[in-house]
Amino acid sequence: TFNVEKVTTVARHHETHASAAFYMSPFKEALIVSYDGGGDDGHFNVYAGNKDGVKPLDNITADFGGGYLLCGSLVREVAEKSRHQLALSGKLMGLCAYGKSIEKHVPAFQEFFFDRDYKKLAFLTKLPLKNIEDPWKNPLENWVFEGQEGYDIAATAQEAFERAFFSVLDRYDPNVPLILTGGCALNVLVNEKVKCLYNRPLYVPPNPHDGGLSLGHLFRYKEPTKQVDITYSGLPLLNKRTDLKFYVAKYNATKVTKKEIAELIKDGKILGLVYGDSEVGPRALGNRSIVCDPNIADMKDILNSKVKFREWYRPF
């Protein structure tokens, strides 16, 4: 038995995402969309944030996160080294730039994001419908596409993802600021289109994925009275008082000017630049950067193969 002396609060998955994002945002009022691969309260939830806190508006029947993940498993370039891993989504997003969306297939993919009925994608295979198995549980060679065909499937999935998302967003008041959170808010292609197509303030937290849930739970327990900006509150790379002195001595390091940095880049060098503390979340947002000259034709390939050790199609 356990002696419980204090009340334990339990916050639901998307409520926690929404709270973290709202209290980190600069907005006093906002429409909050939280969507990902799913939690105890669904996959796609909409909230209103205002002076009274974060309140639920809708639970949408959709699975954009799981659907997009499964689309990644259909493309060999994406799936062959990382099947069933969450990295599939980010890789699919990178690969889609090499393909062209197949317009006639977009509606089927759109429907797929709402119900994840894989049989709606049966036209992608040569198997009779009765022989189709769940490609997520039982990967079949017939489901895997490669080369330009695979790139086009990736582009089609991304296009359908965007249209499906906009079809939901258009149901709500366009005159209030918008906050996007949940793992799907890491799809920067969607975020950029929202920014360009919708004339409204937009905020995406640096940690919209599940790594931000603990902060959201804290905010639900004790609501902040002002914006909490933790974007650059991660760990420092070096302790200036101890580590920096050690490495300066070890490598006989000297201070460099901005002009010298520019000259090194001009000469084809690849540099790592670090400022202050690390960013919170999975994305580098300026305080830790790899910089190089993009005018060098094969620089992307050099970065991917020798520095980041990742797939050839990943962008800068």
Question: Residue spans of the language-model regions?
Answer:
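Short, flexible coil/linker elements and helix-boundary hinge sites characteristic
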Residues: 3, 126, 173-175, 252
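Flexible beta->alpha loop and helix N-cap segments adjacent to enzyme active/binding sites
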Residues: 2-9, 15-116, 121, 186-187, ...
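Active-site cores of enzymes that catalyze phosphoryl transfer or operate on phosphate-rich substrates
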Residues: 94, 105-156
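Short amphipathic alpha-helical segments, especially helix-boundary/capping motifs
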Residues: 45-46, 139-146, 168-171, 193-196
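Glycine-rich beta-strand-to-loop/alpha-helix junction loops that act as flexible
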Residues: 177-186
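Phosphate/ATP-binding catalytic cores across multiple sugar-kinase/actin-like superfamilies
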Residues: 155-178
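Alpha-helix N-cap/helix-initiation motif
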Residues: 154, 158, 179, 203-210
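Short acidic-aromatic active-site loops that bind/stabilize oxyanions
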Residues: 8-11, 147-163
